[in-house]
Amino acid sequence: TNGDSDISVDGTTLTITPPANYNGSEDVTVTVSDGVLETSESFNLTVNPVNDAPTVQDVAGTTAEDVDFVLELDGTDIDGDELTFLASVSANGSASVSGSTLTVTPDADYNGTLEVTVTASDGQGSGSGLLTLEVTPVNDAPVILGLEDQTIDEDTSLTLDINGLDVDGDALTFSATNGDSDISVDGTTLTITPPANYNGSDD
C-alpha cells in the first residue's frame, strides 16, 4: 500500500504506477502473510521529475483577403516552463511570431483556407497545434493594361483596343470621357473623334 500510486501484486511481482506527471517521494508498505500471521515492511520510493512537452490546442480563425490575422498564442506546460513559439504556413501565405503574438499574412489577392502549424517549445520538448484560417474573398478593382499617350493628325479619329485585368475573373465593361472630343466604346474598342479643325492636347 501507499498514497496515490496504483499498486498491484502478481505472485511475487510488485508493480507501482505513480499518477500521471507526479514526482516526489512516497512510502510503500509491503505485507506478506502465511494465512495466519503477517509481516509488513516499508520502503521509500522517489519519483524523479522528467520534462513534459508543452501542448498547443487546434484553433480556427477568419480574416478577409489582403488583411493580416493576429492571434495571441497560448500553450500549456504542466511543468510551468516558459514557452517560445514558432509558426509556419503550408502554402499561400507567411507567418511570424513576436513573443506570443502570431501574425499570419495571406498572399496578395488570395482567398481560401490557410493551415498554420504553431509549435511551442520549453527548451527540452515541443508540441504543435494547427490554426485553420479561412480567408474570405473581397472584390478587387480591375486595372487597365497598356494605355499610353497617343498622337493623331487634325481631323482624324483614333481607334484603340483596350484591355483590362480583373484578378477575381469578373466580366469587364469599359467607358471613357474627356473634354470636347466625341468618344465611343464598343466592347473593347475605343474610338475618339476630336472636333473639326481641333489640335492640341486632350485628357
Task: List the model feature ranges, each with a label.
Residues 1-52, 62-141, 148-203:
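Acidic, turn/loop-rich segments in luminal/extracellular domains of secretory-pathway
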